[in-house]
C-alpha cells in the first residue's frame, strides 16, 4: 500500500492549518523584504536586535578568515575548536555555573540533555505547554513520561509522588506561544522537596530577562541548586545560532559521554562561535537594549488594550493576541500584511484548539513609531475582520430564514 500523502496535505489545507514558508529576501531586522514585498516585521525572535549588528557581523567575518566556514567534524573527533571552547567558558561564567556545553540547535540540546539523564525505570515530568522539542525528548527518553497542568506546582507534586527512579522535571522558562513565565521558585521547591532535578529551557529568556540578560533564573534570583540543568539558545536573544547546556562538572561530562545529539553531529562553524562571543559581550554591556525593549512592550500593551484586543499575561517580548479560529487568525494576518505589517498567525496543533492567535514579537531594534504603526494597522484590521464576520453571520441567518 502506498503512502497517501496527497490526502493528508488536502486535509490540512481544508482545516486552514497548512504551513508555508515565507521567503526572506533581506537581512533580519524590523524592515524586511518577504516574497518581494517590503514589510515591517513583528515576528522575529531577534529580541535584542543583534542578528544584524555590525560588530557581530565583523566578528563572524574575522572568525571565518581565521577558522574557515565549517566545523569539520564532531566535537569529539577534531571539531572542537578554540572559539567553541572560549564560548563555552564565557557562557559558564555568564550563567554562574562551572561549565557549559555547546549544541548545534536548541532542539538537539533539549533532546540530548533529557535522553542522557533519564531512561527506562526513570521518570520525566513536563509542563503541558512545553516546546515540542522538550516533549519529543521526554517521549524518546524511554522514561515514564507524564505532563502536569500548565504552571501548576500542585499538579506537579501529585505526579512526583508517583514517580520512580531518577526524576527530571522539565519546563520552558518563557512559554513560546503565550509569553508567560514558569513559576520557577514554586516548581523548584516542589522538585527539591521530592529529590527531583529541575531542567529549564530558557530559550526566550536569555537577553530580555534579568538585570544583566541572564534570563529567568537571574530574574528570580535562583541558582544551580534550584535549577541543576539550564538550557539556552543562541538564535534568539543572542542573535546568532546554536544552543548550550550549563551546569555542574558532572552534568556536562555526562552529556559529553551520553548525549547522542552532541556526540554524533558535526560542530557548528567556529566563526559562529566568534560572532556569539561578540553578541554576548554586547548583550551584557548594552543594558539600554533591555530597557528600550521593556518600554516598547509596555507601549504596545497599552495600545492593544485600548483597541479592545485580547492579550495574554506577558511582560516578555512575546505578545500574543488571541483570535480564536484558525481562519480568522490567518485572515487578520493577511489584512495586516496588506497594510505592510508582518505578524505570524499561530494555529493548532502548535496551540490548543480554538486558541489561534497572532504572535507579535517585539525587538530592541524596533522604534516607538514602528510600534505605533503596528497598533494603527491592528485597529484597522480588527475592525475589518469584525465587519467581515458580522456580514457572514447575517448572510447565514438570511439563508436560514
From Swiss-Prot:
Pathway: Cofactor biosynthesis; biotin biosynthesis. Substrate binds at residues 19, 131, 350. It catalyses: 6-carboxyhexanoyl-[ACP] + L-alanine + H(+) = (8S)-8-amino-7-oxononanoate + holo-[ACP] + CO2. The keyword Lipid metabolism does not apply. Pfam families: Aminotran_1_2 (PF00155). Its EC number is 2.3.1.47. Its cofactor is pyridoxal 5'-phosphate. One of its GO terms (biological process) is biotin biosynthetic process. Keywords: Biotin biosynthesis, Pyridoxal phosphate, Transferase. Homodimer. Belongs to the class-II pyridoxal-phosphate-dependent aminotransferase family. BioF subfamily. Catalyzes the decarboxylative condensation of pimeloyl-[acyl-carrier protein] and L-alanine to produce 8-amino-7-oxononanoate (AON), [acyl-carrier protein], and carbon dioxide. This is 8-amino-7-oxononanoate synthase.
Amino acid at each position: 500500500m502506498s503512502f497517501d500523502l496527497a490526502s493528508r496535505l488536502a486535509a490540512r489545507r481544508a482545516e486552514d492549518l497548512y504551513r508555508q514558508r515565507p521567503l526572506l529576501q533581506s537581512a533580519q531586522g524590523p524592515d524586511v523584504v518577504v516574497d518581494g514585498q517590503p514589510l515591517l516585521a513583528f515576528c522575529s525572535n531577534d529580541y535584542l536586535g543583534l542578528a544584524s549588528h555590525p560588530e557581530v557581523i565583523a566578528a563572524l567575518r574575522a572568525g571565518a578568515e581565521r577558522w574557515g566556514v565549517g566545523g569539520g567534524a564532531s566535537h569529539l573527533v577534531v571539531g572542537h575548536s578554540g572559539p567553541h571552547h572560549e564560548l563555552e567558558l564565557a557562557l559558564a561564567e555568564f550563567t554562574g555555573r562551572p561549565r557549559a556545553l555547546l549544541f548545534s540547535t536548541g532542539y538537539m540540546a533539549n533532546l540530548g540533555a533529557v535522553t542522557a539523564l533519564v531512561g527506562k525505570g526513570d521518570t520525566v515530568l513536563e509542563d503541558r505547554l512545553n516546546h515540542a522539542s522538550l516533549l519529543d525528548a521526554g517521549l524518546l527518553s524511554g522514561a515514564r513520561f507524564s505532563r502536569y497542568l500548565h504552571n501548576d506546582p500542585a499538579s506537579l507534586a501529585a505526579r512526583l509522588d508517583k514517580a520512580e527512579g531518577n526524576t527530571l522535571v522539565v519546563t520552558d522558562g518563557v512559554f513560546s506561544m503565550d509569553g508567560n513565565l514558569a513559576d520557577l521558585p514554586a516548581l523548584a521547591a516542589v522538585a527539591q522537596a521530592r529529590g527531583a532535578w529541575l531542567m529549564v529551557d530558557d530559550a526566550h529568556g536569555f537577553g530580555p530577562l534579568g538585570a544583566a540578560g541572564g534570563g529567568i533564573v537571574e530574574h528570580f534570583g535562583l541558582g544551580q541548586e534550584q535549577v541543576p540543568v539550564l538550557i539556552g539558545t543562541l538564535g534568539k536573544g543572542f542573535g546568532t545560532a546554536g544552543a548550550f547546556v550549563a551546569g555542574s562538572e558532572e552534568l556536562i561530562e555526562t552529556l559529553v559521554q551520553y548525549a547522542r545529539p552532541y556526540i554524533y553531529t558535526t560542530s557548528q562553524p567556529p566563526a559562529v562561535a566568534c560572532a556569539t562571543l561578540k553578541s554576548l559581550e554586547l548583550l551584557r554591556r548594552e543594558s539600554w537594549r533591555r530597557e528600550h525593549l521593556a518600554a516598547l512592550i509596555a507601549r504596545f500593551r497599552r495600545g492593544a488594550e485600548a483597541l479592545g484586543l485580547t492579550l495574554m499575561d506577558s511582560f516578555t517580548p512575546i505578545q500574543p493576541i488571541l483570535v480564536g479560529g484558525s481562519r480568522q487568525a490567518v485572515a487578520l494576518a493577511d489584512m495586516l500584511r496588506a497594510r505592510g505589517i508582518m505578524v505570524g498567525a499561530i494555529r493548532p496543533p502548535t496551540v490548543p484548539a480554538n486558541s489561534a492567535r497572532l504572535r507579535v514579537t517585539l525587538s530592541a531594534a524596533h522604534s516607538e513609531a514602528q510600534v505605533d504603526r503596528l497598533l494603527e494597522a491592528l485597529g484597522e484590521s480588527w475592525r475589518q475582520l469584525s465587519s467581515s464576520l458580522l456580514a457572514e453571520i447575517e448572510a447565514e441567518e438570511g439563508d436560514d430564514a
